[in-house]
């Protein structure tokens, strides 16, 4: 789980139409998380990165392949690293057309700067997740490309991930035979807890696992895995110790309320086990 960064915003310009250059310089990006350009994340340390992660040649942490190789890939004997770009990548954008352009540019950038230069790295297909049809087209565009290992979604979205607005994404992923990674965090515009915004960074971090449980429950109960039986999901950076108890509780409630979800042919725990 590696988060590559751009040294500058202009680094994406070779893969963006000129209209988006001026748009970004004039208006920036606007996620569903309020009308703000910066990410809705605690600002204690840029990019949630260590201070010694700044590349010696300058730029943001995670923006230098050579420094990543020296500091992380080589000393830790990394055999395979999955790139999961976060931030202003097109996910959670209010302007869906801009989101699609950014996502496509990020995907080309991953190949040009990272995977083509180090075979230990594989990219994730970034998509404009709130526009399911356009996102599915981007996934199909990358079909058969060995640079990509998975599609990429985030756990906090406008709606829970099982909602039908996201189904075209799952259909495309199943079609090309790639799993979909669901990385913690996102730009859905909703509070990160079920009862509002918390006070502390600790609560933010604990909330990742809670949000992934919501996402997984939605995927199961909305019937995503029943509709797409060959789809596989990867829940990223939110732990997994909660999975057995979640599966048990879903089964317990399902035994009493299964008439509400007749589209499910098996127990929730079985879908979780198989997908």
Protein language model features and the residues they cover:
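Helix-coil boundary/capping segments in enzymes
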Residues: 2-275
């Amino acid at each position: 789980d590696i988060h590559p960064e751009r040294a500058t915003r202009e680094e994406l310009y070779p893969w963006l139409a000129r209209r988006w250059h001026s748009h970004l310089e004039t208006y920036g990006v606007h996620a569903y998380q309020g009308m703000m350009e910066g990410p809705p994340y605690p600002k204690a340390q840029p990019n949630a990165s260590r201070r010694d992660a700044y590349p010696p040649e300058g730029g943001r942490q995670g923006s230098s392949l050579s420094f990543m190789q020296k500091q992380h890939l080589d000393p830790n004997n990394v055999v395979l690293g999955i790139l999961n770009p976060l931030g202003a990548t097109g996910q959670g954008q209010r302007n869906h057309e801009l989101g699609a352009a950014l996502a496509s540019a990020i995907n080309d950038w991953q190949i040009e700067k990272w995977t083509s230069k180090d075979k230990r790295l594989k990219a994730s297909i970034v998509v404009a997740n709130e526009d399911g049809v356009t996102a599915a087209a981007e996934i199909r565009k990358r079909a058969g490309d060995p640079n990509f290992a998975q599609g990429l979604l985030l756990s906090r979205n406008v709606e829970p991930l099982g909602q039908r607005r996201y189904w075209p994404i799952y259909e495309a992923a199943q079609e090309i035979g790639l799993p979909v990674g669901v990385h913690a965090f996102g730009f859905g515009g909703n509070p990160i807890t079920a009862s509002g915004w918390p006070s502390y960074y600790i609560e933010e971090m604990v909330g990742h696992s809670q949000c992934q449980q919501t996402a997984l429950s939605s995927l199961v109960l909305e019937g995503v895995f029943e509709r797409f039986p060959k789809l596989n999901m990867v829940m990223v950076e939110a732990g997994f110790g909660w999975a057995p108890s979640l599966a048990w509780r879903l089964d317990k409630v399902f035994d009493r309320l299964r008439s509400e979800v007749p589209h499910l042919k098996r127990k929730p725990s079985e879908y979780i086990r198989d997908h």
